[in-house]
């Protein structure tokens, strides 16, 4: 069926997906828990969000240089199965830099209302678990380096697959480098 955004709703088979993720494991880990801080953890991420990212990467709507050509030849069902597999896994937890926790938590929970920046909790939940029905990703436990890179990419207009509302670009424009460092560290330790 088609959802509000016109994307087909994920109808993946996690068991089938397990057999299709071997190549993914080199960067993202066999269970979706990347050991490299610049590659995102996919484990436990919402199926809808994962499927959107896979489709955007495959179509070129989201440029991810290390994934160039990796999804070529994969069917819609393959992508749905891969998304279902990673969504069914448990994300490993990380730790925040204690020196950055207070600032990161203040941004995550309170935003910068004086600058029109809402709290992250509104879309990504107070625990960072996201909202898969709305397509908002889980952030809690994600690698801080990866989160920092994505926030920077949104801020600089390098990443633009946040929809017509440009919500993440508008939010990231209000973040300084110090804000991004604190927020991404806090998110890494959030679970």
Positions of predicted regions on the chain:
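Electrostatic cytochrome c docking/interface patches
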Residues: 4-21, 35-38, 88-114
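The canonical Cys-X-X-Cys-His
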Residues: 24-30, 82, 117-126, 183
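Short, solvent-exposed interaction modules
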Residues: 95-136, 144
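Detector for the c-type heme attachment site
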Residues: 26-34, 87-88, 123-129, 188
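The feature marks the first
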Residues: 14, 18-60
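Axial heme c-ligation environment in periplasmic c-type cytochrome domains
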Residues: 35-41, 56-99, 132-138, 156-190
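Sequence context surrounding c-type heme c attachment/ligation sites in exported
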Residues: 15-22, 47, 51, 111-121, ...
